């Protein structure tokens, strides 16, 4: 069952009908998402029984009382027209108005994306919103979704009208790089420990073979004994019993990303002498330019 610090995402039950009706009857909630306000508790119960039946359809509940305050679903192949692939799905969600502005929906979306990519094997998640639903787009933007296209005159059958629809998507690869960048940025803090030592001007994050993220910052000294951020992240990983590296990102002093230094690349080769070529390096985070260690490191350098 997906959950966060504040939330539980659980299956819908008949007893949720009253709570569902309380929030779904609000005209500020459903129409902008493409469905009319609920008219009765009984209608809400029928929707629980006949609509919220998808394998990955969940009620958003606060842990404090387990009461349904919104809905979120990964619409798998057969329940979406955005993709026909078995390893892709569409994300849909809404939240009761009393809970807007509390960062609840971004929290739920982050967890459902983790669930999609790590638990059920999705490689891409699609999402859409209708023109004017800026709250929905902000949630998608916070989660890392990339704009794909706009379609005009889209049928909205439950509202008996046509609208302009916008579509975005997020791949597993993009999601992993976003998490790595955020992890590296979170530990990057330049500081002076003494007149001879400064730390944190450069930070790095590594995605290990197990899917864990390890971070490190650079340690610069007035001698040649400084340690790179990537190397500290690698040592952190080794200390935790791992040695397989999947992805590496280093954030430079100006906030851009760049390649690991020669010494750090040599360490990665030593750790993975037969597989190092497949390690992915983020060269330009904004432009999403990635190279492999094999492309970055010529054979003569290894030999």
Which positions does each model-derived feature cover?
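Compact, glycine-rich, soluble single-domain proteins
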Residues: 217-231
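Conserved GNAT-fold acetyl-CoA-binding loop/helix
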Residues: 28-49
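Short glycine-/small-residue motifs
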Residues: 71, 215-216, 247
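Acyl-donor (CoA/ACP) binding surface of acyl/acetyltransferases
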Residues: 1-28, 61-176
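A short helix-loop-beta-strand connector motif used in the catalytic cores of GNAT acetyltransferases and
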Residues: 48-59, 70, 197
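Cytosolic beta-strand hydrophobic patch enriched in CBS
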Residues: 57-63, 205, 281-283
């Amino acid at each position: 069952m997906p959950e966060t610090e504040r939330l539980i995402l659980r299956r819908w039950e008949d007893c949720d009908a009253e709570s569902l009706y309380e929030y779904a009857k609000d005209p500020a909630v459903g129409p902008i998402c493409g469905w009319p306000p609920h008219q009765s508790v009984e209608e809400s119960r029928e929707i629980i029984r006949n609509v919220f039946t998808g394998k990955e359809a969940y009620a958003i509940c606060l842990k404090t009382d387990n009461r349904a305050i919104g809905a979120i679903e990964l619409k798998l192949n057969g329940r979406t027209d955005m993709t026909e692939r078995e390893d892709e799905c569409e994300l849909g969600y809404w939240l009761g108005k009393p809970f807007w502005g509390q960062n609840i929906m971004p929290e739920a979306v982050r967890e459902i994306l983790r669930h999609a990519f790590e638990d059920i094997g999705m490689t891409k998640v699609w999402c859409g919103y209708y023109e004017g639903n800026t709250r929905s787009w902000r949630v998608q933007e916070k989660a890392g979704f990339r704009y794909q296209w706009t379609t005009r005159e889209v049928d909205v059958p439950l509202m008996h009208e046509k609208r302009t629809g916008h579509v975005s998507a997020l791949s597993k690869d993009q999601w992993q790089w976003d998490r790595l960048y955020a992890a590296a940025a979170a530990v990057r803090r330049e500081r002076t420990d003494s007149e001879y030592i400064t730390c944190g001007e450069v930070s790095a994050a590594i995605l290990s073979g197990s899917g864990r993220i390890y971070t490190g910052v650079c340690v610069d000294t007035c001698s040649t004994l400084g340690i790179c951020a990537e190397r500290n992240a690698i040592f952190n990983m080794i200390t935790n019993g791992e040695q397989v590296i999947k992805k590496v990102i280093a954030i430079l002093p100006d906030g851009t990303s760049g390649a690991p230094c020669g010494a750090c690349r040599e360490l990665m080769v030593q750790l993975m002498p037969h597989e190092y070529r497949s390690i992915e390096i983020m060269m330009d985070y904004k432009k999403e330019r990635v190279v492999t260690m094999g492309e970055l490191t010529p054979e003569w350098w290894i030999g």
